[in-house]
């Protein structure tokens, strides 16, 4: 069965975290919030002051290879401070590199979290992200597309909080049956 990791750090955007979380929960696909930070209690303070406890810390996972044995989807949300932490953490970078090489593994990045493609050294791809990071992505050799969601091989990127539901649904579409996807889509009352 598919299992999802949703990375989280202090400063992560609440909407970009909550949308994919809710979508995978509705689909009854196991999902963990994996904290990247130093708080031993895994208490995360999001970008707009929402606080939550993550399921586990990345420090509990010995290596990117062990991570790949436990998870099939790695999601990297944005939020200025959170995205900076996630995109500069060697463990997250290694996970992204490992997942990119493996079949049946998916990487999702949204908003400023898309900078992780650059810091992880992923090959130049078509990508989207928050307009504020467009220049940095283009400087890294990526072709920025002004679209809500971009699917390029096993990398799915999205622009920001306003596109978070579409982002979560695109990730779900890759791993769920058509019936399951349609049931979740309908349950969300999407326009």
Curated annotation (Swiss-Prot):
Protein family: Belongs to the peptidase C56 family.
The protein's name in its UniProt record: Glutathione-independent glyoxalase DJ-1
Main localization, broad class: cytoplasm
Biological process according to GO: cellular detoxification; glyoxal metabolic process; response to oxidative stress
Molecular-function annotations in GO: glyoxalase III activity
Matches recorded under PANTHER family: PARKINSON DISEASE PROTEIN 7 HOMOLOG (PTHR48094:SF12), PROTEIN/NUCLEIC ACID DEGLYCASE DJ-1-RELATED (PTHR48094)
Keywords assigned by UniProt, alphabetized: Cytoplasm, Lyase, Nucleus, Stress response
Active site: 16, 111, 130
Compartment(s): Cytoplasm; Nucleus
Catalytic activity: methylglyoxal + H2O = (R)-lactate + H(+)
Matches recorded under InterPro entries: Class_I_gatase-like, DJ-1/PfpI, Prot/Nucl_acid_deglycase
Pfam families: DJ-1_PfpI
Role according to the record: Catalyzes the conversion of methylglyoxal (MG) to D-lactate in a single glutathione (GSH)-independent step. May play a role in detoxifying endogenously produced glyoxals. Involved in protection against reactive oxygen species (ROS).
Gene3D superfamilies referenced in this protein's UniProt entry, alphabetically: 3.40.50.880
Disulphide-bridged cysteine pairs: none
EC number, UniProt record: 4.2.1.130
Mutagenesis or variant effect for residue 130 to A: Leads to 5- to 6-fold reduction in catalytic efficiency
GO cellular component, one term: nucleus
């Amino acid at each position: 069965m598919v299992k999802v990791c949703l990375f989280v750090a202090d400063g992560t955007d609440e909407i970009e975290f909550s949308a994919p979380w809710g979508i995978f929960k509705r689909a009854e696909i196991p999902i963990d919030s994996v904290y990247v930070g130093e708080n031993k209690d895994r208490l995360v303070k999001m970008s707009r002051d929402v606080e939550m406890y993550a399921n586990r810390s990345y420090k509990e996972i010995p290596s990117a290879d062990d991570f790949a044995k436990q998870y099939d989807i790695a999601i990297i949300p944005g939020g200025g401070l959170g995205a900076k932490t996630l995109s500069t953490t060697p463990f997250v970078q290694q996970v992204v590199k490992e997942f990119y090489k493996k079949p049946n593994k998916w990487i999702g990045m949204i908003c400023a979290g898309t900078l992780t493609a650059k810091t992880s050294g992923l090959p130049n791809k078509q990508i989207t992200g928050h307009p504020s990071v467009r220049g940095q992505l283009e400087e890294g050799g990526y072709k920025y597309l002004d679209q809500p969601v971009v699917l390029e091989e096993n990398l799915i990127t999205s622009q920001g909080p306003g596109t978070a539901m579409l982002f979560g649904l695109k990730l779900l579409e890759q791993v769920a049956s058509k019936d399951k996807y349609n049931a979740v889509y309908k349950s969300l009352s999407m326009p």
